[in-house]
């Protein structure tokens, strides 16, 4: 009998919302509007230099240049995980409806 692989897809809609994700990471976001500021975890930081976009989780550090398009990219960089491992960590891999 032939073994069958079950596809366990990535589910972008299952990623946590940026406000919840960054709060759970212990990061305090300050400011108003579409972009917020916080300390950057990718370098020693004493003044908030990381900007986070609240609709997508996109981020950019104005000091070290770290950047990405969503909370998944942030998680991958912060914890050194690949795409699949980070998606699994965030509950967005293979989650079915």
Predicted regions and their residues:
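N-terminal structured subdomain of primase-like DNA metabolism proteins
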Residues: 1-97
């Amino acid at each position: 009998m032939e073994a069958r692989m079950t596809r366990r897809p990535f589910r972008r809609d299952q990623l946590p919302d940026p406000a919840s994700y960054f709060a759970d990471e212990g990061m305090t976001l300050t400011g108003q509007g579409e972009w917020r500021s916080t300390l950057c975890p990718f370098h020693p930081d004493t003044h908030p230099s990381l900007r986070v976009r609240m609709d997508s989780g996109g981020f950019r550090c104005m000091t070290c240049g770290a950047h990405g398009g969503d909370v998944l990219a942030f998680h991958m960089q912060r914890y050194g995980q690949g795409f699949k491992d980070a998606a699994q960590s965030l509950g967005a891999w293979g989650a079915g409806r």
